Each structure stands twice: as structure tokens, then as C-alpha cells.
């Protein structure tokens, strides 16, 4: 079996059933846990995915199947293009949205199941790896919305797949772009993988050829090379024996400021271990207000679908960084190239005036010419701070809590002269549904409160991003 997206789900659902004639699977751009990392992310509803995908990919097909005319389908598509971005995503409550009842009623099931429960467990790939006895050629892209689950599928199959053949034969191929390409800038060249990877996999497991596939590289990773100026970057492929790559080192960069890190014009600093006690950065915290009626707009990122209305991928962040509800922490220019390859994690301390709220972190590359681009971003809901599979627990207002957040996976060169930047806020809309800050069910209510947020970064509450650094990975000479 082969193909991607929804057809990737089909493969992951079929393989645990062990159909007798299934020899191998090759799923692409699809995750593992369809609750966390798909319809929800750390407890937050993936609003854009959950509305744009049914509106564009499911409902037109269902209309044709129901006997509706091309004119009716065209009228629907016009309705979507006129209303999805400007109207539908703003409607509250989420459960009151009425456009999908006839042809995409599963949307309301998604909204009705914000917690991981039996609804999600029955389709959860991440619990079924021991039942899968065939190898998987797993592929994805760094700007795909399901890349966290893609990597998890590879890791799960390699470690606990249901047969030696499944464990030893599973491979990972990660390219550059989004779910169906993307319109982002900068670009990163042609990330088409070597076609022999697939052919050798198929020849070995479908035809039974003794072609030495077992000795081929385990992972193939496309490394992004951003430009120093302009919007034309490049990239190159590397191989390895695992993901993360053996020999990966972790470098922590700490959030600091003089107490006014709001906007990219503020005094936020991202400092390495050697500079974390610099007396210039003595302010213990930064503050901002999060208003659900004026959320931070989504600018690029790992999204699906309808990139015409909401572009995905790498985009310049400099305009949105002028908002006062975004804290911005920037390093000094890097003295040499740094290969960041692996899983990026963040640990931070936060307080809120609300019983529940969200926090977002974004990793940004600042180019020497002043342009920027997002590398990774992620969100976490306060009530799910201990994990999306555990019972949600509201926070006590104005009390500090530690959050750990996996931003995702990447392979990029942070080039000499570039700066590392971290943005902290509480929304990315309409990528994610807004937390209304009331502590009530965000999916079935519409009352909103403004939350007063504090990010702590003193000695007792260190907040930092952890970057996976791989030595000796350099940009090939042209």
C-alpha cells in the first residue's frame, strides 16, 4: 500500500489487521495519534485544518455523490472562498457552526470530543505498532502539520514494531515543504528524494529481491539552507542511522530581558548557557495581555489546507512581531553555521490571570538582511499542561506553572550572521481555535475574558528552548 494524507491513514489502519497479502506500506504526510497532533494539538482544536479540509476536500465530493449538480458544487466552493477565512473561523461557539451538518457531520464529533477518549483510542496508530508486522517507508515534510506524528510512526515501528522485518525494514524520508507543497518564502530548493529509495524498498519487500536494502541508510533528511538575503534558499540531503541522529547534542538558549520583551523592538534576549547570568538581563519576567477577540494572526507554519486563503510554510514574521501581545527574544548573530537537526523542545514558566489559557512558542530564523522566517511553532493549553491523555486540570490564577512543549522536528542550518529568535504569545489564529480564557468548555461556549499573562525567566524559573545540534554537518560547496 502506498500514498499519503488520508490514504496514509488508510494504511496505518489496515496494517495492524495483518491482511495476508500486505507485504509493506509506504504512508506519507500523516501522523499517529489523530487526537493530539492532528485534530487537536496539546488540547487545542486545529481550527483551520478542521474547517478547511472538509470544506475543500470532502464536501464537494459528497455533494456529487448525493447527485448535486456542478453548479451547486461551484456555488459551495464560492461560499467557502468568501466565508471561511473572514467569517466561519470566527464563529462561536465551535459547536454551533452549522455549515457542515449535511455532508461533514464528523466535524461535530471532533468538536464533541476535546479529550482523548474511546472515540480517539480506537483509531490511534501510536498504540498499534506491535500489531504491525510489515515494514513501513515513512515519509513527510518539515512544514507538514503531521510531521510530529510522522516521526513518531518511524520511531515506534523501529522500536516496537511487531516483527523483526518491520523493525529493521522501516525507513524515514523527510523533505522540506508542506502538506501539498506550500507558498512560503524563503524557498529551499528542490527536495525531491532519490527515487531509488522507494524502488529498492518495493523491489525488496514486494518482489523479494536480494538487493542489499537492509544495508541502505535508515533515514534520509533534507536540510534547509535559508538565504542570507532575499527569499531564495537551498537545501541538501543527508543520511543517518536513526532519528534523532546519533551524536546529537542539546544546546539550551534562555529567555531574558529587562522586563520589556514585547515586540521585536523590545529588550528580549535569547542567551546561551555562558550568558544566562549576565547582569543586564535581571528582570524576572515579561508580561502581555491576550484578548481572544484580537488574537495573534497566523503567519505561515505547519498547516493544511487551502493555502490560498491562509498561506502555509516559511514566511516573514517581522510584521506580526510588532504586536504588543508577542514577547520576542533574540540572540546575538551566530559566529558560525549551526546544524539544528532533530526534535526542538521548550521549557518555560508562566502565570495567567485566567483559570485556563493557551501559550504559543515559535522558533524564528532572523536573516542578516532583516527578513525572518518561522522554523517551528506549537501551542499548549494550560489545562492540558501535563499531557493531552491525562485528565485536564485548570490552573490557579497568578500562580507559576512549568510547561514543557515539543515544537516539532526540523533539519535546518542556522547560518553564520543569522540570529535565533523565540516568540511567545497565546494565540495563532485561525491555525488554532482561540482559548476563551473562562475555564469553561471552549468548544461549546462563547463568553470571553482577557487574560493577563506572565512569562517568568528568573533563577528559580528558567525558561529556555533546547536545540538539537549535530556537529560536522556543513553546507556542500557548489
Language-model segments: residues:
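Short beta-strand immediately N-terminal to the catalytic nucleophile in serine-hydrolase-like folds
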Residues: 1-3, 139
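Short glycine-enriched nucleophile-adjacent loop
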Residues: 8-19, 348
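Short beta-strand/loop motif that positions the catalytic acidic residue
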Residues: 132, 138-140
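Acidic catalytic loop of the alpha/beta-hydrolase fold
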Residues: 142-147
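Active-site-adjacent alpha-helix of alpha/beta-hydrolase-fold enzymes
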Residues: 148-169
Amino acid at each position: 500500500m502506498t500514498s499519503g494524507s488520508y490514504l496514509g491513514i488508510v494504511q496505518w489502519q489496515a496494517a495492524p489487521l495483518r491482511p495476508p497479502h500486505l507485504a509493506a506500506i509506504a504512508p506519507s504526510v500523516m501522523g499517529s495519534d489523530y487526537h493530539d497532533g492532528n485534530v487537536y494539538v496539546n488540547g487545542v482544536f486545529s481550527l483551520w485544518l478542521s474547517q478547511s479540509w472538509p470544506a475543500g476536500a470532502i464536501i464537494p465530493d459528497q455533494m456529487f455523490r448525493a447527485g448535486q449538480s456542478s453548479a451547486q458544487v461551484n456555488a459551495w466552493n464560492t461560499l467557502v472562498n468568501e466565508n471561511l477565512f473572514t467569517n466561519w473561523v470566527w464563529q462561536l461557539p465551535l459547536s454551533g457552526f452549522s455549515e457542515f451538518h449535511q455532508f461533514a457531520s464528523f466535524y461535530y464529533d471532533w468538536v464533541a470530543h476535546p479529550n482523548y477518549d474511546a472515540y480517539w483510542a480506537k483509531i490511534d496508530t501510536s498504540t498499534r505498532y506491535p500489531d504491525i508486522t510489515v515494514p513501513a517507508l515513512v515519509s513527510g515534510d518539515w512544514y507538514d502539520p503531521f510531521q510530529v506524528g510522522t516521526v513518531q510512526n518511524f520511531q515506534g515501528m523501529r522500536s516496537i514494531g511487531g516483527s523483526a522485518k518491520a523493525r529493521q525494514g522501516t525507513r524515514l524520508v523527510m523533505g522540506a515543504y508542506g502538506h501539498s507543497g506550500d507558498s512560503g518564502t524563503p524557498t529551499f530548493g528542490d527536495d525531491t528524494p532519490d527515487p531509488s529509495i522507494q524502488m529498492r524498498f518495493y523491489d525488496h519487500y514486494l518482489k523479494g529481491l536480494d538487493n542489499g536494502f537492509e544495508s541502505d541508510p535508515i533515514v534520509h533528511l533534507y536540510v534547509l539552507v535559508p538565504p542570507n538575503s532575499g527569499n531564495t534558499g537551498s537545501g541538501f540531503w543527508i543520511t543517518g542511522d536513526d532519528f534523532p541522529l546519533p551524536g546529537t547534542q542539546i544546546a539550551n538558549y534562555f529567555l531574558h530581558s529587562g522586563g520589556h520583551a514585547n515586540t521585536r523592538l523590545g529588550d528580549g534576549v535569547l542567551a546561551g548557557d555562558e550568558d544566562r547570568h549576565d547582569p543586564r538581563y535581571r528582570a524576572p519576567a515579561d508580561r502581555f495581555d491576550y484578548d481572544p477577540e484580537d488574537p495573534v494572526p497566523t503567519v505561515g507554519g505547519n498547516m493544511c489546507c487551502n493555502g490560498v486563503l491562509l498561506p502555509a510554510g516559511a514566511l516573514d514574521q517581522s510584521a506580526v512581531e510588532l504586536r504588543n501581545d508577542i514577547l520576542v527574544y533574540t540572540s546575538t548573530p551566530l559566529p558560525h553555521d549551526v546544524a539544528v537537526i532533530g526534535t526542538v523542545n521548550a521549557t518555560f514558566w508562566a502565570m495567567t490571570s485566567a483559570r485556563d489559557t493557551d501559550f504559543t512558542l515559535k522558533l524564528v530564523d532572523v536573516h542578516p538582511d532583516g527578513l525572518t522566517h518561522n522554523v517551528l511553532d506549537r501551542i499548549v493549553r494550560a489545562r492540558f499542561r501535563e499531557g493531552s491523555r491525562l485528565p485536564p486540570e485548570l490552573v490557579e490564577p497568578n500562580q507559576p506553572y512549568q510547561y514543557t512543549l515539543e515544537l516539532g522536528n526540523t533539519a535546518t542550518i542556522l547560518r553564520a550572521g543569522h540570529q535565533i529568535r523565540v516568540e511567545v504569545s497565546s494565540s495563532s489564529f485561525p491555525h488554532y481555535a482561540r482559548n476563551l480564557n473562562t475555564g469553561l468548555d471552549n468548544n461549546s461556549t462563547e463568553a470571553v475574558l482577557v487574560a493577563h499573562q506572565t512569562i517568568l525567566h528568573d533563577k528559580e524559573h528558567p525558561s529556555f528552548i533546547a536545540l538539537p545540534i549535530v556537529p560536522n554537518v556543513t553546507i556542500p560547496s557548489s
